[in-house]
A protein has these predicted regions:
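Exposed beta-sheet edge and beta->alpha loop/turn motif
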Residues: 85-154
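Short solvent-exposed beta->alpha transition segments
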Residues: 21, 31-36, 46-93
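Sec-dependent signal peptide recognition
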Residues: 2-8
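N-terminal signal peptide c-region/cleavage motif recognized by signal peptidases
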Residues: 11-16
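Cleaved targeting-peptide boundary
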Residues: 17-26
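Generic anion/oxyanion-binding catalytic loop in active/binding sites
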Residues: 8, 22, 38
């Protein structure tokens, strides 16, 4: 079953004047998980950000955290998510565009795709409970502007 979802634009940019964005940890939908991931990054809560990934889907924690050493904040734009059901789980692919504001005052734009898996909660009967998790993420640097970049999982 494929289910197209509405395109969502999320600005998670935290300005110096307003401080860190409000805390968001929402695992209700695949889109919310990706938004929560970047909320954690904007708040420098890297362990929380890392926790949205399935075991083995992200680099070890030290490498993951150090990958954001030069990041001041990020902006996220989600494309249209597509979900497919399979034997007790739903896999959702979400295209993204990210603008990373760096500590030296420059920025970089990345395009890519996250794949998330939701195991049907009604079939989970042994700890630990598995919420929606990121099973894969692929980002590449883009030469397009944040506004012009087209989110795609192709």
């Amino acid at each position: 079953m494929k289910r197209p979802l509405i395109v969502t634009l999320v600005s998670l940019h935290a300005s110096v004047a307003t401080g860190a964005p409000d805390y968001m940890d929402d695992r209700s939908s695949a889109e919310d998980v990706v938004q929560s991931l970047y909320n954690a990054i904007n708040r420098s809560e890297y362990l929380r950000a890392w926790s949205y990934f399935q075991s083995g889907a992200a680099p070890n924690y030290a490498d993951f955290k150090s990958g954001y050493n030069d990041t001041r904040s990020v902006e996220l734009r989600l494309g249209q998510a597509v979900s497919e059901g399979a034997a007790g789980s739903i896999e959702t692919r979400i295209p993204v565009v990210i603008r990373s504001h760096l500590t030296d005052g420059t920025h970089a734009v990345f395009e890519g795709c996250y794949t998330l898996v939701q195991v049907d909660p009604s079939v989970q009967d042994a700890p630990p409970f598995r919420p929606i998790q990121i099973s894969a993420g692929h980002l590449k640097k883009s030469s397009s502007s944040f506004e012009a970049a087209a989110p795609s999982c192709d």
